[in-house]
């Protein structure tokens, strides 16, 4: 007895795990890295999805802050370079604590003038210290 054509099984579209979850970061690659790194004996399927989503969120947040910092530089063109990414990360409290031990190459240092090096206002000019 043949089955009618309308009773065929529903064909499921194939696609990546990232596309199924609505993410840009590669869920399969993150899961493979978790398994190869041997962080645990068993890793569930949702663990890779969750980690990829967290990484994607943090990256989007850092890029958003970097674009704002580059736009505030006052130049006509907005260009992202390691320096603007580092400055944006260091000036944000949450991301700054996450990345406080991270060194970004070709980014320089955060400009900071210590109070001891700053010029003191209201100093007396007339008195000179005797040198012996």
UniProtKB/Swiss-Prot annotation:
A GO cellular component term found in this entry reads:
nucleosome
Keyword terms of this UniProt record: Chromosome, DNA-binding, Nucleosome core, Nucleus
Q: Which InterPro entries match?
A: Histone-fold, Histone_H2A, Histone_H2A/H2B/H3, Histone_H2A_C, Histone_H2A_CS
GO MF annotation, one? protein heterodimerization activity
Compartments, as annotated in UniProt: Nucleus; Chromosome
Q: What is its quaternary makeup?
A: The nucleosome is a histone octamer containing two molecules each of H2A, H2B, H3 and H4 assembled in one H3-H4 heterotetramer and two H2A-H2B heterodimers. The octamer wraps approximately 147 bp of DNA.
What is this protein's record name?
Histone H2A.1
Species of the source:
Leishmania infantum
């Amino acid at each position: 007895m043949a089955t009618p054509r309308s009773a065929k099984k529903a064909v499921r579209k194939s696609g990546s795990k990232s596309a199924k979850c609505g993410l840009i970061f590669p869920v399969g690659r993150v899961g493979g890295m978790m398994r190869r790194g041997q962080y645990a004996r068993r890793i569930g399927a949702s663990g890779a999805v969750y980690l990829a989503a967290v990484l994607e969120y943090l990256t989007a947040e850092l890029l958003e802050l970097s674009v704002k910092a580059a736009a505030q530089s006052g130049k006509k063109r907005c260009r992202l370079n390691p320096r603007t990414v580092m400055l944006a990360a260091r000036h944000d409290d949450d991301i700054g604590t996450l990345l406080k031990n991270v060194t970004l190459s070709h980014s320089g240092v955060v400009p900071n003038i210590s109070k001891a090096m700053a010029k003191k206002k209201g100093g007396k000019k007339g008195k000179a210290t005797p040198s012996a």
